[in-house]
Amino acid sequence: MTLPSDFPLEPPATNKDPHRDYRGLDRSKLTPMYQHYVEVKETYPNALLLYRVGDFFECFFQDAVIISRELELVLTSKEGGKGIGRVAMTGVPHHALERYSRLLVEKGYAVAICDQVEDSTEAAAEKRLVERAITKLLTPGTLTDEGMLNAKKNNFLAAVVITGENWGLAYSDISTGEFYTTQASDLTALSLELSRLQPSEILFPINAPDLNRILRPGEKSDHLPPCLPDSFCYSLRPQTIFTLTEAKNRLLITYKMRSLEGMGCEHLPLAIRAAGGLLEYIEDTQKANQVPLQPLKTYSISEFLILDGQTRRNLEITQTVRDGSFYGSLLWAIDRTCTAMGSRALRRWLLQPLLDSRGIRARQDTIQELKDNPALRQDIRQKLREIYDIERLSGRVGAGTANARDLLSLAASLVKLADLAALVASGNSPYLKALQQIPADLEKLGQQVIAHLVESPPLHLKEGGVIREGIDAQLDALRRDYQEVIDWFKNLETTEKERTGISNLKVSYNKTFGYYISLPRSKADFAPKDYVRKQTLVNEERYITTELKEKENIILTAVDELNKLEYEIFSDLRRQVAEFSPEIREVATKVAALDVLAALAEIAVYQGYCRPEIADGRLIDIKDGRHPVVEQSLGAGFFVPNSINLGNQEGLEYPDLIILTGPNASGKSCYLRQVGLIQLLAQTGSFVPAKSAKISICDRIFTRVGAVDDLATGQSTFMVEMNETANILNHATDRSLVLLDEIGRGTATFDGLSIAWSVAEYLATVLQSRTIFATHYHELNELASILENVANYQVTVKELPHEIVFLHQVRPGGADKSYGIEAGRLAGLPTSVIDRAMQVMGQIEKHSKIAIGLRQGIKKIKPVKSDNSPSLQQLDIFDDSK
């Protein structure tokens, strides 16, 4: 970064190290400003302190070293006082504070903003230090400023309390006011829930010297139990804040209640402790800004479909596996929402699909109604585009940080809500009915704000010019007086030219002298007697008059009074709006839900999605299903649809497990993800990319698609694969959907085949999970001849004399070739390598005995649900004695 020319750069001194820590200095020798800096820093030792000095926010000592490194700023030094020498210093311009603060917070730091809280001219006149105070404490989980937040993503702050195997979790997005808590007894479930939420910051209580320290992602600490992923940012908080009594009292006081029974957490002590500790942290970091949180809601993790981190990653729900980008994810493909709050809601829905068929059908009914009524759908979507992010706007209003533009945007949106209610008045589906009754007071409130504020208010409130004329009589009178003086100044130059006869006389202004009259030096002798000389320049003389200074004082006084009065009027208006924050946020939740469903109806129409029938039992019956992302990437008509039938149950001879074989790069992994995404979309309440679909609810989706070395934990690709597979076998049920791709490939062939066979057999006979098992071990096709609930499918190809054509069609039957050498040819391997590979493969196929005898003497077995191991008859197929 290149600093502005007026930034106080000085070369570091060579006699003393400017990078010293302040704790090793004699503070009495520091200048008064540095003494105050150190005093503030000791109050916030775990935050980076940005300290206002003129037009810059500066930092010193070790904070300067850290910030210069993280932000790539110039590290310089500044005189610290007699006998101290120079101290390390860097800084940022005041107008760039938000940008640089955001960068530091994104890197996992807490940032304390120490700003001037009085006019510097008053302090200068009294020859004292300008009064400064901490005005903001920014941490990763407590951001509210629009410029620091991702409009389409929640910024969650979480708190965790753990006792043995039991845990409590609370989380909130203070920019929207959402506040939830839960309690459970499985530490693995805690890790899954944190992985779903992806909180920006997690509070964890300890009783140790590291209190209030923030651990950046990846930073290790003995204070954190192994069950907590180290990929998050943790703030270590005092245990005393998280005691049950302290936490319960804080919740009762905050919500002005006598009991927590209405919140549903009365008998969940760990959930209460987590919620109370989180509340305390919000109060501590937000200072004078009271965050208007929504009522605390208690939920159970058993209410939703479980998606572990591996599944979310493999299904590419919010970001791609390859580069972590939004483009190419499921969310990218289906997010047609018109508002930021709708986009956030869609993300939450995708990461927390429903298990309740009634909730799913309620969403489907609304999508169906909007799909069948294109005019209504388009009118709703057009009206939604006119509505701002009222969820976060109401939060800033409630916290007292909203500016005039924020308030005007909120007001305009409140007025539009009445139009939206009118549009859905005839709706019959649940989510349309929810918006038919919008409080009339909200529209009146919006109209009141619009009537008070000018159409294009300035960004900063203290610039004035915010309130319309005719709102306040005193304000109008001050403005008239001010305008009279301004008009006098406008006419002064003409008047003085006529009075003096000096045609090149000018009336000007600067910050040093204020208003003055300028004459060329050649005309100085003609200056009237009432002109008082103030400054002589090379070609110019500058004068003032008694009347001019009197008028100037009137202007300065009037501006100050005007700005103060306008700010009072605006603040009062903002307080009135803040009283309606709960009602506004309740409506915002309904608007966001309607936005999501209208967007899903839109994509259902234009991408040809069908309404899935939510069936009882364990059924997955999809006809001509498509991958929602790949089909959009390829364009209309290019994607090859495929069907699937899974879920063996009475009256249906569908398999529980499909062995899927086929060539490399033929589309097996795409097919696996396609089935998983259709199941997920169905339980989100969305329509799905298929000709028709009949789908039962599943409790979990497991995926194991591809693996890489985990260098951080020293695990090989194969070990990562085995850990993921073990997790599936230990947690899957007959209501789960399991999608496996190439189990056992990271070890010797016999070992890999043995593991793959055993895993598939266990899934089919013991767990009876609905499973697609993609593999290049063609020997696994023999399972279908052994187990009644296993079927073979293959991704077909067309063989030509010198090449193969991928048809991307999934058909019954097992493949006996993987065409890996042909894939190598397509990738550009040298011809000599391809030819040699063909020779080697011929020899291997000729002499291999892996598959000999697999069909001999095997009677087809009907699996029986059991907690025991598969029968010996199933395992005896490898017995040499047979």
Swiss-Prot record:
Signal peptide: none annotated. GO terms for biological process: mismatch repair. Gene3D superfamilies: 1.10.1420.10, DNA repair protein MutS, domain I, MutS, connector domain, P-loop containing nucleotide triphosphate hydrolases. InterPro entries: DNA_mismatch_repair_MutS (IPR005748), DNA_mismatch_repair_MutS-lik_N (IPR007695), DNA_mismatch_repair_MutS/MSH (IPR017261), DNA_mismatch_repair_MutS_C (IPR000432), DNA_mismatch_repair_MutS_clamp (IPR007861), DNA_mismatch_repair_MutS_core (IPR007696), DNA_mismatch_repair_MutS_N (IPR016151), DNA_mismatch_repair_MutS_sf (IPR036187). Keywords: ATP-binding, DNA damage, DNA repair, DNA-binding, Nucleotide-binding. The keyword Transcription does not apply. SMART domains: MUTSac, MUTSd. One of its GO terms (molecular function) is ATP-dependent DNA damage sensor activity. Residues 1-22 are annotated as: Disordered. The keyword DNA-binding applies. GO terms for cellular component: cytosol. ATP binds at residues 662-669. This protein is involved in the repair of mismatches in DNA. It is possible that it carries out the mismatch recognition step. This protein has a weak ATPase activity. Belongs to the DNA mismatch repair MutS family. This is DNA mismatch repair protein MutS. The gene is mutS.
